[in-house]
UniProtKB/Swiss-Prot annotation:
Location(s), subcellular: Host cell membrane
Region Immunoglobulin V-like domain, annotated ranges: 36-138
Spans through the membrane: 278-298
Gene from which this protein is expressed: UL8
Gene3D superfamilies per UniProt: Immunoglobulins (2.60.40.10)
Induction: Expressed at late times of infection.
Organism whose genome encodes this protein: Human cytomegalovirus (strain AD169) (HHV-5)
InterPro entries: Ig-like_dom_sf (IPR036179), Ig-like_fold (IPR013783)
Major location category of this protein: host cell
The protein, known as: Membrane protein UL8
Family label: Belongs to the RL11 family.
Modification note: Highly glycosylated.
Membrane topology category: Single-pass membrane protein
Keywords in alphabetical order: Glycoprotein, Host cell membrane, Host membrane, Membrane, Transmembrane, Transmembrane helix
Source taxonomy: Viruses, Duplodnaviria, Heunggongvirae, Peploviricota, Herviviricetes
Length: 324
């Protein structure tokens, strides 16, 4: 019984001594081993602005600041207990201190990883700080237009009879050209364009007739009708009414040039219908040929299969002469 108690006390004493021994070793390691702390700080700044990288170092500590370019590090600041020594990176402008550095005039190339190392008494206590700097691109500047030119076009004014025109008729040549050009065949268009003159179509006004010379003075609200016979004449305003002129001068109908249009063999609508009809006929022929081809392709394998089946079932039949 006594031996059991003594052995138990010895075991407890040994275990306590082991715990104290391990604690002492950890305490000794903690006192003589440098303490290293690492963290990452994310910082961003605008392009062209300034950014400050702040550390938790005190003013009586020495610090080294680095800029990492891939796997290479470049010393950009060395602050030794109140004495700042700056070694700027290429194109890098900054102010250096123990607890912070400020980078001026940020560019997109300044983005990257930076590091700060603080130490006292020859590296006895070291602290590492990592900075991930992101430079945001400068937004594009938009400028408003200060000088804006407004173009005002006046409409022509038509009063009185055919030969009297007042007001600014700057749009008249262009309107005549558009009205006469919309519903014409290519051959007729080429004829009129070769003359270099504007078109004056026959108007739907009941006061005008096909045999009457029309000098082109009409209102913008009237609709033009280009339907005419081969015997009808079109009258242009002569060479003075160019399409590129900004103003129009009223011309005496006696000075007008008469242009006889070329005869039209088929209306445009009928020609278009014939082309469509021919197009559909070709499609119908192609469809019939495809259907016949598909039927032949579907029946051919069936015939081959039937012939093979008959040969397999009955074999070949030979005609023999039994007479001697």
């Amino acid at each position: 019984m006594a031996s059991d108690v003594s052995s138990h006390l010895l075991t407890v004493t040994q275990s306590r001594w082991t715990i104290h021994h391990m604690y002492n070793k950890l305490l000794i390691l903690a006192l003589f081993t440098p303490v290293i702390l690492e963290s990452i700080i994310y910082v961003s700044g605008p392009q062209g602005g300034n950014v400050t990288l702040v550390s938790n170092f005190t003013s009586n500590i020495s610090a080294r600041w680095f800029r990492w370019d891939g796997n290479d590090s470049h010393l950009i600041c060395f602050y030794k207990r109140g004495e700042g020594l700056s070694t700027p990176y290429v194109g890098l402008s900054l102010s250096c201190a123990a607890n912070q550095i400020t980078i001026f005039n940020l560019t997109l190339n300044d983005s990257g990883r930076y590091g700060a190392e603080g130490f006292t008494r020859s590296g006895e206590n070291e602290t590492f700080l990592w900075y991930n700097l992101t430079v945001k691109p400068k937004p594009l500047e938009t400028t408003t237009a200060s000088n804006v030119t407004t173009i005002v076009t006046t409409t022509p004014t038509v009063i009185g009879t055919k030969s009297n025109v007042t007001g600014n008729a700057s749009l008249a040549p262009q309107l005549r050209a558009v009205a006469g050009f919309l519903n014409q065949t290519p051959r007729e268009n080429n004829t009129h364009l070769a003359l270099g003159e504007g078109f004056v179509p026959t108007m739907t006004n009941p006061g005008l007739y096909a045999s009457e010379n029309y000098n082109g003075n009409y209102e913008l609200t009237e609709a033009a009708n280009t339907a005419r016979t081969n015997s009808s004449d079109w009258v242009t305003l002569g060479t003075s009414a160019s399409l590129l002129r900004s103003t129009e001068t009223a011309v005496n109908p006696s000075n007008a040039t008469t242009v006889t249009p070329q005869p039209v063999e088929y209306p445009a609508g009928e020609v278009q219908y014939q082309r469509t009809k021919t197009h559909y006929s070709w499609m119908l022929i192609i469809a019939i040929i495809l259907i016949i081809f598909i039927i032949i392709c579907l029946r051919a394998p069936q015939k081959v299969y039937d012939r093979w089946k008959d040969n397999k079932q009955y074999g070949q039949v030979f005609m023999t002469d039994t007479e001697l």
